[in-house]
Amino acid sequence: MLNFQKLERSHLPRLLPYFRGQERRLSNYSAGFLFMWGRYMDTHFAEAEGCLLLRDRYVGKSYFYYPLSKDGDAAAEERALDALEEYCRSSEERLHLTAVPREKLAPLVERYGADLHVSNIRRWRDYLYDASSFRDYPGGRYSGQRNHVHKFEKTYPDHVFRTCEAEDLPAMQKFLCEYADTQYDKDDVLADEEMQGTFDILPHIAELGLYCGALYAGGKMVALSVGERCGDTMIIHIEKALRGVAGAYPAVAQAFARTFCADGVRYINREDDSGDVGLRKSKLQYLPVQLVGKYNLAVHRAIDSLSKLPSVQTARLTLRAIPDEDAPAFAVLARDEELNRWWGYNWRERTSAEHPEDKWFLEDIRFDFRHKNEIPLGIYFGETLVGEVVLHSFGYRAEAEIGMRVLPAWQRRGIAREALLGMMEYGFLKLGLERIEAKCFKENEVSARALRAALEDIYRALGELRPRRGRVLLTLDDAPPAPGFEPARQLGTFYAWRRS
């Protein structure tokens, strides 16, 4: 199980190997970006299969980056994605991928099918440039930039570009204070966050392995640039110039490229424009070779398409939503200690009331359906509620887990077997599930018999299905505490039905 922890800036030096070799050419997968924006985005991280997994939180929702290996190991990244799917399934978090590189789109569509919502928002796309173009500003297309640089050089003949070292920190901070006093919109939350991140990162330039240079004119710092090399790309995290110093921006951009963007640097990533009109115009004037998409993928599960509970008819039974008038009967089922011992759910963990009203149990399962956690259906023999069958723990590759409980007076009549078969047929044929799982403790002979019988029935009824059976060790999480019962020591039976 993945363990996401808050990404502190002190973690980043240890994580640098993940960023240094990445060839995605996206600014999001870099130490400088995460240092400056990680607090704002409430970034957390985990490691699995030799990969780094990142998670942002925005408006109460989680957004996961595509796993990043240190050496571009696609197989390891897919295994890490498996772990992420299991994490989301177990923690009931939605799998929403963000900042996905374009080259990962096709494998993800193949992995999850067509039931995806994909977006690629224009204002967050990174501007990617040919590094040689910035070094030389060649040809007629860059005549404007060359003219601005020539004007700067003519106006400030004593200009010089220097690499910044630790002893230059006071001068850099003084420059930023002058810049901040006049040149950014303090009412813009993103601009304010970016400015604070700029101040914060300067003392950590060497620690993060960043490149930093400043342009001086008349002995005064007039422009500053900070970048980070990731693979064959230099990502420009900071570029500031004082207002009134004509030509300082194209001059510092060129000087930085000539100083740091050689020896295998093919591209310069100047990040996004955040939807700022002036910034967009400026970035386009430098003629990007590509606007690098950052794709967002919301992966849908089979349950997400349901707006109301279904009704399933079998030979003797009806599986349907439980109405208000059956709240007392359902409460009897929900309160049955022996049944709940095997059910894997302790209602006492969901309420502080020692003796909740009957209606509470019904509202509890309705809550779970509204939040797309499960499909709970009452098992009806005629008009009598005799049990419950549930599809739950929905995964992101068309899988779910099934469970059922039948009142003692109605057991040993084949009801559990028939209800399981009906629910599985619905899951496979109507919901489009590819895999249904069932678990039970070996002491629970009633459920074990029903599962074995349902396995035989489903195989006969749906010949395209291939049954599979294995052995697993169930943990304390698989069942609620019960007097004298230690489920962690019980070896249970795991059944899985998968479409061929």
Question: Could you say what each language-model-derived stretch is?
Answer:
Residues L2-R14, G140, V160-K174, T318-V332:
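A short beta-loop-alpha structural element at the N-terminal edge
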Residues N28-E103, Y216-V245, L391-R397:
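Conserved donor-binding loop and adjoining core beta-sheet/short helix segment
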Residues S90-P101, A262-E271, L429-K439:
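Conserved GNAT acetyl-CoA-binding A-motif
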Residues K104-V118, S274-L291, R417, K442-Y459, ...:
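Conserved active-site alpha-helix within GNAT-family acetyltransferase domains
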Residues G113-K186:
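Acyltransferase donor/substrate-recognition loop-hinge adjacent to the catalytic core
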Residues S119-D136, N269-L306, L462-A479, T493-Y495:
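Active-site/acyl-donor-binding loops of N-acyltransferases
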Residues L210-A298:
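Aromatic (often tryptophan-rich) hydrophobic motifs at membrane interfaces
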Residues C230, I268, H300-N340, P376-S500:
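Acyl-donor (CoA/ACP) binding surface of acyl/acetyltransferases
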